[in-house]
């Protein structure tokens, strides 16, 4: 195989190595699924550090095909005769063939496909590539299922597949049911390659709903948050119930334990971000002092979502669904699978409410006095929805997150510190959002 992966790979939006100096991409594993379809595992080498593995499904044709989008065309291969390689996920026939392999629990070479017990896959549904994914590629099959193909693959048990399977088999109603998956083995380590879940048709993302609510609030200058037509508090209560339900199922199915507060982990992040972001440095000592209050405290931990925010929840006609259980982006797999306090997820949601309210102020600009008035309304919206979320969580679990104020504040600070590092690097204009939150939590 002689495709120009070196040129094509760095242009893909799901490619995760942009912060590193690219060296080469080599097709080390090629599994022929059928005559015109190969599953390719690339080893990507960098000037420094460890290599990474990426998965590409290649559809072959004798000549270029006009109906493929430009992003799908990888290039020409002259090693096995003149032929053109495409990203196969953009070919409906190839995507459908992958679904049939999962449906039959086939094994092709070292690639193992598996259908979950007592499920039906939509083999007659028409596939289309979703435009929503960033780090993976998803193919939607009509209104019935979504096939998520992992691009950067890592060794070990994939938490998205693992936790979806646990929750689905336990009958939890707040996840999209897992229908199937496929994986391989490299150097005696399992590598998850993809998964199929039920598709949440006619759903709305929590982030979009929250933004609509804040837009309505800011547009109605003489109304309070509970008087605006787009009030989100009722949904926040139901969302709190859903998160608590998922936590309860994970705790019941996978167990709980008592461990010390992860002081070393949060201090390491704090040091790293403070070194990189001057705006955080004056407050690093105060944040550390808040963390150290919990140094001798044992906390209850179990498996959690790990990266929960309003963009990871979908509102369907039946209720809220939690999606994407992969954990915090960029963290090693063992960290993403490590049990943590449920306050980690609660803190992620509370931070997301602040972003939903305050990012509109960042984007709109305006005169200082008007912005001050809108900031007060944003704070009102955040407080109302945080309260409703915690009320819902308490109603479903019997545990009110606000009863663990110091622990919750520590996890909120840790999340905000992470956000400071992210915003300083990628969206400097948004840096005031987490910085102001840190000052609020510290009481400055």
UniProtKB/Swiss-Prot annotation:
A family per Pfam: APH
Any GO molecular function: ATP binding
Swiss-Prot/TrEMBL keywords: ATP-binding, Carbohydrate metabolism, Glycogen biosynthesis, Glycogen metabolism, Kinase, Nucleotide-binding, Transferase
This enzyme's EC code(s): 2.7.1.175
Record's catalysed reaction(s): D-maltose + ATP = alpha-maltose 1-phosphate + ADP + H(+)
Pathway: Glycan biosynthesis; glycogen biosynthesis
Superkingdom assignment: Bacteria
Annotated signal sequence range: none
GO biological process: carbohydrate phosphorylation; glycogen biosynthetic process; trehalose biosynthetic process
Coiled-coil spans in chain: none
Entries under InterPro entries matching the protein: Aminoglycoside_PTrfase (IPR002575), Kinase-like_dom_sf (IPR011009), Mak_N_cap (IPR040999)
Disulfides per UniProt: none
Family statement: Belongs to the aminoglycoside phosphotransferase family.
Assembly notes: Monomer.
Function: Catalyzes the ATP-dependent phosphorylation of maltose to maltose 1-phosphate. Is involved in a branched alpha-glucan biosynthetic pathway from trehalose, together with TreS, GlgE and GlgB.
Name assigned to this protein: Maltokinase
Organism in which the protein naturally occurs: Mycobacterium sp. (strain JLS)
